[in-house]
Each structure stands twice: as C-alpha cells, then as structure tokens.
UniProtKB/Swiss-Prot annotation:
Record protein name field: Uncharacterized protein ORF3
Membrane listed as a keyword: yes
GO CC annotations, alphabetized: host cell membrane; membrane
TM ranges: 278-298
Biased composition (Low complexity): 67-83, 113-125, 135-144
Segments for region (Disordered): 1-174, 216-240
Keywords noted in UniProt: Host membrane, Membrane, Transmembrane, Transmembrane helix
Chief localisation class: host cell
C-alpha cells in the first residue's frame, strides 16, 4: 500500500492543476503551455488538450480538461485509494470540478455537445412549423374534397346485374316447345317441328328400347381358389381331337364293290408282308381313314392267317 500511494500521486498532481490553471487566466496562451506540460507527463493524452482550446473559446476548454482529468482520477481511484487524496490537497477548486464529472461522466460530454444540439435544434425549429402549416393545408384539402372519401364506398358495393336482352320471338310458322325456358337465338333458322309422338317414331327403335334398358348378362366370375381336382391331361375327352368325318353313305356301295374286286390282289400283297409291316400299315390307315375299311382289311387278314381246314 505504501509503495502504490507515493507513485501515483506524483504524476497526476501536477497534470490536473497545470491543465486547469493555464486556460483559465489567459485563453490565448493555452495552446503553447499545454503541449509542453503533457509532454513531461506521459499519463494524460497530449492531443486532446489542444483540440478543445482551438475549437472553442475560454468557456469551452474548462469542461474538457475536467473531463480528461476525471478519467485519470477514475483510473487512479481504481488503481488505489490514496490517489484521491492528492488532488484536493494540491488545489481546492480542482477537487469540486473533478468530483462531479467522476460521479456523473455521462452529462459532462453532453455539455460541449449542447451547443451543437442547440444549433441543430434551432434550424429544426423553423422546419417544424412548416409541417403544422402543411397539416392544416392537408386537412383543409380533405375537408374541401369530401367526394374522394365517399368514392371508394360504391366500389365495394355489389354492382347491379346488366339488363337481360329481350327474348327473340320465333317466326309465326315455327312452334317452340314449352319446356324450353331460355330464348332460342336461332329460332328463325330452325325448320318447323313436325315430330310424331315418341312411341310411333320407328318400330325398330321401339323394339331396341327395352333391350337397351336390360342389365348386362352376368359374366362367370373367376374362381377365387384353384380347383381341388388335378389339371386335366391332354388325352382327356374334353381336349381329344375330333375324329375324321365318315364317308358319305352314298359312296359306301361303290367303296364295297371296289374293295371286293381288289380283295384278291390286296390279300396277295398283304400275305407277302410281315406282321410288323402289317401293323404299321394298319396304324397309318387308321390315322388317315375311318375305322370301317380298316376293320374290313383286318377281317380279310385274319381269314388269310387262318385258312380253311
């Protein structure tokens, strides 16, 4: 504590009184004296001191040094408690000036800005009256023009429907059915209606009318599940091929006569063939011909195989 107390008081003590004493007696000598003293004291900033002196007269530099001394005093107060004791001991007038800015730093910066604000307000004050003057003018315009306020009301109201055109009267020779409620624009172009009653239009139409009203036939619905019986084999009677057509009965006598005449020669030929070849021959004949002549040939073959005893 003892080491901190003597070190801070020595630099700040000369700086605040010198800054305040130089501008107060002679405002003109302030620019020369402050730069020399701040150079000796590195703590306070040298550039801010000449700016307030040049910007304003003797009245303005008084608050800025107090403002700049107040941050230094506030920094000293934050660093150590004994820093606050040297300023009052050095000069009594500086203590009251330093204490209020330290307590309320916000109002002091507004003091130099107050003339600027006042100057800004002064031009604004003449500009403020014109809006009131314009307001009465707008109100007078609104009061003088009531029709625009009432004009939008009819826009929102439903418009009346357009008048309907007069119905066209058909020519004297045209008969219009009474069921037609709307006017016919082409009534003059229509030919005279001479239709008979509905039941006597046409006999075909009368017959087809009930057929059209009948419901469609019931189609067989597909099976929901597969049948329990096994699938039909290709040899089943349902899928068997149709047999070849039988010979015409008129040709049967001629066929029998031809076979009887050719029987001896056929029997001789069949006797020369072996049994396997005969079986093959009968099979081919049964495929391409009806079974009746094959039965005859087979009977003849049996007669040849078993001759008379």
């Amino acid at each position: 504590m003892t080491s901190r107390a003597p070190s801070p008081p020595t630099p700040p003590c000369p700086s605040p009184p010198a800054l305040k004493s130089s501008p107060s007696p002679v405002p003109t000598a302030t620019p020369a004296s402050p730069p020399l003293k701040p150079l000796s004291n590195p703590l306070p900033p040298p550039p801010p001191t000449p700016r307030p002196s040049t910007s304003a007269g003797p009245s303005t530099p008084l608050p800025p040094p107090a403002l700049r001394s107040s941050p230094s005093s506030a920094l000293n107060a934050s660093r150590g408690a004994p820093s606050t004791s040297p300023p009052p001991s050095s000069s009594p007038p500086s203590s009251p000036a330093s204490t209020p800015p330290s307590r309320t730093p916000s109002p002091t910066p507004t003091a130099p800005a107050s003339p600027v604000a006042s100057t800004a307000m002064t031009p604004a004050s003449p500009s403020v009256p014109p809006p009131p003057s314009a307001a009465p003018s707008s109100s007078a315009a609104l009061s003088s023009a009531p029709p625009p306020s009432t004009a939008p009301l009819p826009r929102h109201e439903p418009r009346p429907p357009p008048p309907l055109p007069p119905p066209l009267q058909p020519p004297p020779g045209v008969r219009v059915p009474r069921s037609v409620a709307f006017p016919l624009p082409l009534a003059r172009e229509l030919p005279p209606l001479r239709l008979p009653p509905a039941p006597y239009l046409h006999p075909l139409l009368a017959r087809l009318a009930p057929l059209r009203l009948r419901p469609p036939p019931d189609l067989p619905s597909p099976p929901l599940s597969p049948p329990l019986s096994p699938p039909l084999s290709p040899i089943s009677p349902l899928h068997a091929p149709a047999p070849p057509p039988h010979p015409d009965p008129v040709l049967l006598p001629a066929l029998s006569l031809a076979i009887s005449r050719a029987a001896p020669d056929l029997l001789r030929l069949l006797s020369l063939l072996s049994p396997p070849s005969l079986f093959l021959l009968f099979t081919l004949l049964s495929i391409h011909f009806s079974p009746f002549p094959i039965f005859i040939l087979l009977s003849l073959l049996l007669l040849l195989q078993f001759p008379r005893t």
